[in-house]
């Protein structure tokens, strides 16, 4: 099944498309780029064999879903759902923008809105959650603007650059999303973006 979000905002066209075989090398390059790796849990250069195992495992894993983010037809990042739990109606999510050229354009905010709408509207889930390195302040603050609440602080949860690093756990409930949705929708449309799933 392919789920695409393709809209024509005044400024930029953003699409989330399913990962394909043609993305194999691109995703490895992105995962190993310093800009992306700095905020991932892994702290080593990912080799081809390790990456191929991860990539090949995507297709048969019903608890995960991956998309490539495109801006104006150019692949610029990746978004995913993980720990998809249909019984408890919850899942985790993450994304990264590998291309510095799209940072500051509101792309991350658009992806956040898209994912929330997809999880609560399309999937009908009750909870969306994520984990973010405490040092990645701009991302966890973006989540909080969208209504995510801090549910945990995992101290010394991972090792980054040889030192323990703290991780923030955040969650958003479907019942809490309507209180934030209108304001966040207005911010996106003010930037010239069409709302996803509208």
Question: What is each model feature region?
Answer:
Residues 24, 35-36, 63-64, 124:
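Generic structural signal for secondary-structure transition and capping sites
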Residues 31, 40, 58-59:
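Hydrophobic residues in alpha-helical segments
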């Amino acid at each position: 099944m392919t789920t695409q979000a393709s809209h024509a905002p005044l400024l930029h066209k953003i699409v989330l498309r399913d990962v394909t075989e043609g993305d194999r090398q691109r995703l490895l390059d992105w995962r190993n780029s310093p800009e992306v790796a700095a905020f991932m849990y892994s702290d080593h250069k990912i080799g081809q064999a390790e990456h191929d195992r991860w990539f090949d495992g995507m297709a048969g894993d019903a608890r995960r879903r991956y998309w490539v983010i495109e801006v104006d037809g150019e692949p610029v990042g990746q978004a995913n759902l993980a720990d998809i739990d249909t019984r408890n109606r919850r899942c985790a999510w993450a994304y990264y923008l590998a291309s510095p050229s799209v940072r500051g354009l509101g792309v991350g905010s658009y992806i956040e809105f898209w994912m929330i709408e997809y999880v609560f509207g399309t999937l009908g889930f009750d909870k969306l959650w994520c984990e973010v390195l405490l040092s990645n302040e701009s991302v966890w603050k973006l989540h909080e603007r969208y209504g995510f609440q801090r549910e945990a602080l995992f101290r010394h949860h991972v090792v980054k650059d040889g030192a323990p690093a703290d991780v923030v756990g955040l969650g958003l409930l479907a019942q809490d999303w309507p209180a934030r949705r209108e304001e966040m929708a207005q911010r996106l449309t003010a930037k010239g973006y069409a709302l996803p799933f509208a």
